[in-house]
């Protein structure tokens, strides 16, 4: 059969809510890879956020930072970064409005002063941190907390792919109105962060632009492509491929444009769809 290229969103798609790759997905992807099909991550995460659990999969490459970074077989073919002065002005705005944030680069994730405490507060949702339930909730994000670098002296402001912000201070619309003409704005890509949170990326850079670039680099027609996703930032990804497959937990916006809907990650959604399309 014709070899396919498959693009995989990570959070809520390849990984379940706890950030783990279900065994059903791991086995199906491995089996499909052995048949010659190619798998690429296509995620809002920057490279520094990709866990070993995900990297252990047989991947041909990745699109990261919401389309700002792309590599094929360890070769970097695309890397977009913020203009330094514009980034510094953005950081000043976030600080002035008491908005916590982290700067995403391939060198690491650089956190604002109170981000760690804010994330723990959000995930606890009123539960005492010393309680058993509280400890379990914090444990679900411990992998992410461990990635955070809290030392401004280590930041290379010339190598930032994206900015994610956790905001409960001002309406999202205020951030959007201030910056949507200058940057690519995406609202609430991580629902637990709250509806006024979001991501800020390079203008006119998203998953579709990166997929188009990658396919052109490989000389592959998009008629042989599939993509799996669950969130708002996967809408453009579905526009770039022949078949867009929404997970059972996908947002309404993505369900409206999906070609198919499969089960949730933990219920074998990826494996079921790969089997349906004859890749395994």
Regions picked out by a protein language model, each given a short descriptive name:
Residues 59-66, 184-188, 246-248, 262-264:
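Short hydrophobic/aromatic-enriched beta-strand-loop microsegments
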Residues 57-58, 66, 179-182, 240-241, ...:
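Short, structured coil segments at secondary-structure junctions
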Residues 36-40, 59-60, 160-162, 223-224, ...:
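Short active-site oxyanion
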Residues 108-226:
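Conserved acidic, metal-coordinating active-site core of Asp-based
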Residues 1-5, 9, 21-22, 197-280:
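Mg2+-dependent phosphoryl-transfer enzymes with acidic/Ser/Thr/Gly-rich catalytic loops
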Residues 18-129:
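Active-site phosphate-binding/coordination module
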Residues 32, 94, 178-179, 254:
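A generic structural signal for well-ordered alpha-helical segments
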């Amino acid at each position: 059969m014709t070899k396919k290229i498959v693009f995989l969103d990570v959070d809520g798609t390849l990984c379940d809510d706890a950030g783990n790759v279900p065994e059903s997905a791991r086995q199906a992807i491995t089996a499909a890879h052995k048949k010659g099909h190619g798998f690429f991550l296509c995620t809002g995460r920057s490279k520094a956020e990709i866990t070993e659990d995900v990297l252990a999969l047989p991947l041909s490459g990745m699109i990261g930072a919401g389309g700002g970074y792309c590599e094929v077989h360890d070769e970097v073919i695309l890397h977009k970064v913020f203009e330094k002065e514009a980034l510094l002005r953005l950081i000043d705005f976030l600080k002035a409005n008491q908005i916590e944030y982290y700067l995403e680069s391939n060198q690491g994730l650089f956190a604002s002063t109170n981000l760690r405490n804010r994330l723990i507060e959000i995930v606890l949702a009123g539960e005492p941190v010393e309680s058993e339930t509280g400890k379990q909730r914090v444990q679900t994000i411990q992998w992410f907390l461990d990635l955070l670098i809290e030392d401004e002296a280590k930041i290379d402001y010339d190598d930032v792919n994206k900015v994610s912000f956790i905001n409960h201070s001002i309406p999202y619309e205020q951030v959007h109105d201030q910056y949507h003409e200058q940057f690519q704005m995406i609202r609430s890509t991580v629902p637990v962060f709250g509806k006024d949170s979001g991501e800020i990326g390079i203008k006119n850079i998203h998953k579709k632009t990166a997929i188009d670039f990658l396919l052109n680099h490989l000389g592959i027609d998009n008629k042989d492509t599939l993509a799996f996703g669950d969130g708002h930032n996967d809408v453009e990804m579905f526009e770039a491929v022949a078949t867009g497959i929404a997970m059972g937990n996908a947002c309404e916006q993505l369900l409206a444009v999906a070609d198919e809907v499969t089960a949730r990650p933990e219920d074998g959604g990826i494996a079921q769809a790969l089997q349906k399309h004859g890749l395994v």
